[in-house]
């Protein structure tokens, strides 16, 4: 795909050309994270997930927009620059060259390259870039300059997922991380509003796997362990990419693991029919059940092949991710799912006021029809009423592709504020930040702030309101 190539320019915050009018009340910064480099010294990365991390940002205030773009100077990127050659493998890219025993030993210790390219979390005045295969990478929120990898004071032994979730009532951020080998385990973490972090539990897993996201309510985490088994030895030997070593074993079923916040070492565990999910938008307690708004896939190979095809411009299989509501009944040990949308898409988000609370609204990106799903990423931003299925949507012009839409709230109401999305326009090879009234998506953008360059399609982001 045209967008998925190396970024050509980095810069600090500078004024952006604005079309339309930026609302005077909109004040704060949207930080976006995604891949920025797709090769290392001529060695081409084979997957969207593999690119070295790039943070792009837009800062609104006083009706103006400033933009910045910076690569993350991770340890892996710096090492390859010192070596003047590619050295590490990645999710969809096998390590270059032949078997390398030093590289294998380093991989066994968890010493591999994390591109830090997936998400960002703002916590206690700090800005952390995240990727699930490594520790957080800190950067300066003022100018995006790299600080470096952090284990948060010795809290994180191996990895820290790229999808932390927050409890609005407490302000605590919870997350997970995987360990491979002896033991295969799931670490559970908490980031507290006072700036302290802790490891609260380590839970054994039956096999090495990949867990991309989880759900969080005010009382529990819900971790869905799909039957995706990692072939560990060939991964360590570097014979194939991480993705090529993932095996779909549906006979295992998907394990549902409910981890109480007040007793994290005593999870409730049971199995249901196999399925896969990349992203869970929100979850909440509903009497004796847990409700999760999520994008559900029938299996892992189909969606993994679709994403790989997007990296190479096709050919595409049918995308099958549907947004819906899942209900977990821990007493009956059952999980049910009801689709709310019949079109495919990704990147569900909710208003921060309802994090881990009952929500009615989900924002996500959607394929306008099946032909779009067979040709590339979503082209439509949608606000969905999860109770009724009612929707409000904006379809981008042909050749434009929006990123995950993030709400900059004006109040605690779920649709009161502005949706901001980083949009790539293939007709001009330029990216811009589009601002929408969250309650009136069909009216189109209130403003577009142009970066004057292309930014590769990104994954996730964080809105940080301006200090008052």
Label every model-predicted segment:
Residues 1-468:
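Beta-propeller domains
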């Amino acid at each position: 795909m045209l967008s998925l190539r190396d970024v050509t320019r980095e810069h600090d915050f500078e004024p952006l050309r604005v079309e339309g009018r930026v609302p005077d009340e909109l004040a704060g910064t949207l930080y976006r994270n995604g891949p920025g480099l797709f090769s290392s010294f001529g060695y081409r990365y084979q997957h969207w997930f593999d690119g070295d991390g790039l943070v792009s940002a837009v800062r609104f205030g006083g009706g103006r927009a400033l933009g910045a773009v910076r690569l993350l100077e991770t340890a892996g990127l710096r090492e390859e620059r010192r070596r003047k050659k590619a050295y590490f493998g990645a999710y969809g890219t096998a390590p270059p060259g032949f078997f390398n025993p030093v590289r294998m030993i380093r991989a066994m210790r968890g010493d591999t390259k994390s591109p830090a390219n997936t998400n960002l979390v703002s916590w206690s005045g700090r800005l952390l870039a995240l990727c699930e295969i490594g520790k957080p990478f800190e950067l300066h929120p003022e100018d995006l300059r790299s600080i470096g990898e952090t284990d948060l004071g010795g809290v994180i032994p191996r990895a820290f997922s790229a999808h932390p979730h927050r409890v609005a009532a407490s302000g605590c951020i919870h997350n997970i991380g995987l360990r491979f080998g002896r033991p295969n385990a799931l670490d559970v973490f908490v980031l507290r509003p006072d700036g302290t972090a802790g490891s609260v539990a380590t839970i054994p897993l039956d096999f090495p796997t990949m867990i991309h996201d989880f759900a969080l309510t005010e009382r529990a985490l819900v971790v869905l362990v799909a039957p995706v088994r990692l072939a560990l030895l060939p991964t360590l030997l570097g014979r194939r990419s991480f993705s090529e070593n993932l095996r779909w074993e549906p006979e295992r079923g998907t394990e549902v693991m409910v981890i109480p916040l007040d007793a994290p070492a005593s999870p409730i565990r049971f199995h249901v029919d196999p399925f896969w999910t990349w992203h869970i938008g929100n979850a909440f307690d509903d009497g004796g059940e847990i409700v999760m708004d999520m994008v559900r896939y029938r299996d892992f190979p189909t969606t993994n092949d679709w994403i790989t095809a997007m990296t190479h411009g096709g050919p595409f299989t049918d995308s099958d991710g549907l947004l819906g509501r899942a209900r977990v009944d821990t007493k009956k040990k059952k999980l049910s799912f009801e689709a709310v949308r019949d079109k495919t898409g990704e990147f569900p988000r909710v208003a921060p006021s309802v994090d881990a609370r009952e929500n009615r609204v989900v924002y996500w990106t959607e394929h306008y029809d099946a032909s779009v799903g067979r040709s590339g990423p979503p082209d439509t931003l949608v606000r969905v009423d999860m109770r009724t299925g009612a929707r409000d949507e904006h379809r981008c012009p042909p050749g434009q592709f929006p990123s995950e839409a993030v709400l900059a709230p004006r109040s605690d109401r779920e649709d009161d504020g502005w949706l901001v999305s980083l949009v790539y326009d293939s007709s001009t090879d330029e990216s811009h930040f589009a601002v929408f009234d969250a309650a009136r998506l069909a009216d189109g953008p209130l403003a577009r702030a142009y970066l004057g360059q292309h930014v590769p399609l990104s994954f996730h982001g964080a809105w940080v309101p301006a200090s008052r």
